[in-house]
């Protein structure tokens, strides 16, 4: 592809510059190969302009940079633009050229992964070759690629979308994080619909205020969705009204789900141990669903996913039937096993205050004994949530064990102390493996254990090193060791 064939560069790349052949695109100078277009982006920690010379040395034939970015004597065309992140996303979309016919995106603090996964499953039930992209990876009829980035950078995203299209995928659901939206990673995606789940405290190390955080998420509606496109909004969150207003002002076709929903109205929920009986109204029809998932938050996620599926071609009756067959996303209230007495042990990704509150509230109805929770907070991230999560854990669980969870460059004991300050009666065990084994060893009949924070993750980040670690594997090992000591 020639540089001038990327529509945005028609005028900027005139003459000989426009004839330059582009063989790839990247914003990482280390990934540059001969013929690449390099995007010199300003980041929080570094300015890509510093690496422009290195990119050229590695083979870059053109550079995208901001209008206020000076790159002297580059030796290749430098295209100065108002919003280089937006331009990078559009260029990546044009370079790779293909994406599934039907694309939807979901934003919100919690539930994005589950909604994207559930939407894929409902589409698949209805006969559409479908995929989902997000925190747990890329899942389609032909692949299960695990990674840990909620919204991939635009080059990687469009490479994956092109591959999925070549594999025959026609429908894809993706997560839209506030970082991804703010950094324009989705700007080249042609969306058919969008969704909002909820808003709580998260990423306060990146966004200055909750209003700024909400504003980043609302870019999905006011910048990315075409006018008239459906916006599925969970109606029962404290920020639902703001999301509805933003989507309405953006010209979206707003459809709400939940107890206050006007599209899918939740009428009744009856909790059982590992499933829930749900009654909803859609138009004039009443549907009874046996949802094979625990927790009110999973009901909300399922309804948002059903809404997305319905506005993209799935009949209501088929969508409701599909809900009875849903499987939880990896690491989302994931039942690992049980003790010899039948006390269940779960792993959950909850690493934010609202998510921790949701999961602990969800297991309470079917817990006849104690709720036991093991959790920690990440280093180099929002410090303000640590005492908040400590208070939530001590209020909603009967036994709290505070441990380490990706301390990164911080002193682990300091992180734990900030949690412990508000976690009345909690036990502190820094070693996460020891904390899990201790929790499993103390389980009694009727108890429920939740190990929160990592979910699907397979590592513990200490300093700059990621050490192999799986909550799922450690809980399974602890249960196995217990069963050896106490056979049924």
Curated annotation (Swiss-Prot):
Carboxylation is probably crucial for Mg(2+) binding and, consequently, for the gamma-phosphate positioning of ATP. GO terms for biological process: cell division; cell wall organization; peptidoglycan biosynthetic process; regulation of cell shape. GO terms for molecular function: ATP binding; magnesium ion binding; UDP-N-acetylmuramoylalanyl-D-glutamate-2,6-diaminopimelate ligase activity. It is an enzyme of class 6 (ligase). Gene3D superfamilies: Mur ligase, C-terminal domain, Mur-like, catalytic domain, MurE/MurF, N-terminal domain. It is found in: Cytoplasm. Pathway: Cell wall biogenesis; peptidoglycan biosynthesis. Keywords: ATP-binding, Cell cycle, Cell division, Cell shape, Cell wall biogenesis/degradation, Cytoplasm, Ligase, Magnesium, Nucleotide-binding, Peptidoglycan synthesis. Its main location: cytoplasm. Meso-2,6-diaminopimelate binds at residues 381, 405-408, 453, 457. ATP binds at residues 108-114. It comes from the Bacteria. Transmembrane segments: none annotated. Its EC number is 6.3.2.13. UDP-N-acetyl-alpha-D-muramoyl-L-alanyl-D-glutamate binds at residues 29, 150-151, 177, 183, 185. GO terms for cellular component: cytoplasm. The modification N6-carboxylysine is found at residue 217. It holds the Pfam family Mur_ligase_C. It catalyses: UDP-N-acetyl-alpha-D-muramoyl-L-alanyl-D-glutamate + meso-2,6-diaminopimelate + ATP = UDP-N-acetyl-alpha-D-muramoyl-L-alanyl-gamma-D-glutamyl-meso-2,6-diaminopimelate + ADP + phosphate + H(+). A motif (Meso-diaminopimelate recognition motif) lies at residues 405-408. Its cofactor is Mg(2+). Catalyzes the addition of meso-diaminopimelic acid to the nucleotide precursor UDP-N-acetylmuramoyl-L-alanyl-D-glutamate (UMAG) in the biosynthesis of bacterial cell-wall peptidoglycan. Belongs to the MurCDEF family. MurE subfamily. This is UDP-N-acetylmuramoyl-L-alanyl-D-glutamate--2,6-diaminopimelate ligase. It comes from Brucella suis biovar 1 (strain 1330). The lineage of its organism: Bacteria, Pseudomonadati, Pseudomonadota, Alphaproteobacteria, Hyphomicrobiales. The gene is murE.
């Amino acid at each position: 592809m020639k540089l001038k064939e990327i529509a945005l560069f028609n005028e900027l790349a005139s003459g000989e510059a426009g004839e330059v052949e582009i063989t790839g695109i990247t914003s990482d100078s280390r990934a540059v190969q001969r013929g690449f277009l390099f995007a010199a982006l300003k980041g929080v920690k570094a300015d890509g302009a510093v690496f422009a010379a290195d990119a050229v040395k590695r083979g870059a034939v053109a550079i995208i940079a901001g209008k206020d970015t000076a790159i002297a004597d580059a030796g290749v065309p430098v295209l100065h633009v108002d919003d280089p992140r937006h331009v990078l996303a559009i260029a990546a979309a044009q370079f790779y050229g293909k994406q599934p016919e039907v694309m939807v995106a979901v934003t919100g603090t919690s539930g994005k992964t589950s909604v994207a996964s559930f939407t894929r499953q409902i589409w698949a039930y209805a006969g559409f070759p479908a995929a989902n992209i997000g925190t747990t990876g890329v899942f389609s009829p032909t692949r299960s690629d695990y990674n840990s980035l909620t919204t991939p950078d635009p080059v990687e995203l469009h490479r994956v979308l092109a591959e999925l299209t070549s594999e025959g995928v026609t429908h894809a659901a993706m997560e839209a994080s506030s970082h991804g939206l703010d950094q324009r990673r989705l700007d080249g995606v042609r969306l058919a619909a969008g969704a909002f789940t909820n808003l709580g405290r998260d990423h306060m190390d990146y966004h200055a205020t909750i209003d700024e955080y909400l504003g980043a998420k609302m870019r999905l509606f006011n910048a990315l969705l075409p006018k008239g496109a459906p916006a599925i909004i969970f109606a029962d969150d404290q920020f639902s009204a703001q999301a509805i207003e933003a989507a309405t002002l953006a010209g979206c076709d707003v459809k709400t789900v939940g107890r206050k929903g006007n599209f899918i109205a939740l009428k009744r929920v009856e909790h059982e141990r590992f499933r829930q009986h749900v009654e909803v109204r859609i138009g004039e029809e009443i549907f009874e669903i046996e949802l094979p998932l625990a927790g009110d938050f999973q009901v909300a996620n399922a309804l948002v996913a059903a809404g997305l599926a319905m506005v993209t071609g799935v009949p209501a009756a088929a969508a409701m039937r599909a809900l009875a067959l849903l499987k939880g996303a990896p690491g989302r209230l994931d039942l690992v096993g049980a003790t010899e007495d039948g006390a269940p042990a779960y792993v959950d990704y909850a690493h934010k205050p609202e998510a921790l509150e949701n999961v602990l509230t969800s297991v309470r109805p079917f817990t006849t004994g104690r709720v036991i929770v093991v959790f920690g907070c990440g280093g180099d991230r929002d410090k303000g949530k640590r005492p908040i999560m400590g208070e939530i854990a001590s209020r909603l669980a009967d036994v709290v064990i505070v441990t380490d969870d990706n301390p990164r460059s911080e002193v682990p004991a300091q992180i734990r102390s900030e949690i412990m300050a508000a976690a009345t009666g909690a036990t502190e065990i820094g070693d996460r493996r020891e904390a899990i084994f201790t929790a499993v060893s103390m389980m009694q009949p009727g108890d429920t254990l939740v190990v929160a924070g990592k979910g699907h993750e397979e590592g513990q980040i200490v300093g700059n090193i990621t050490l192999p670690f799986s909550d799922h594997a450690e809980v399974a090992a602890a249960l196995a060791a217990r069963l050896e000591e106490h056979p049924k």
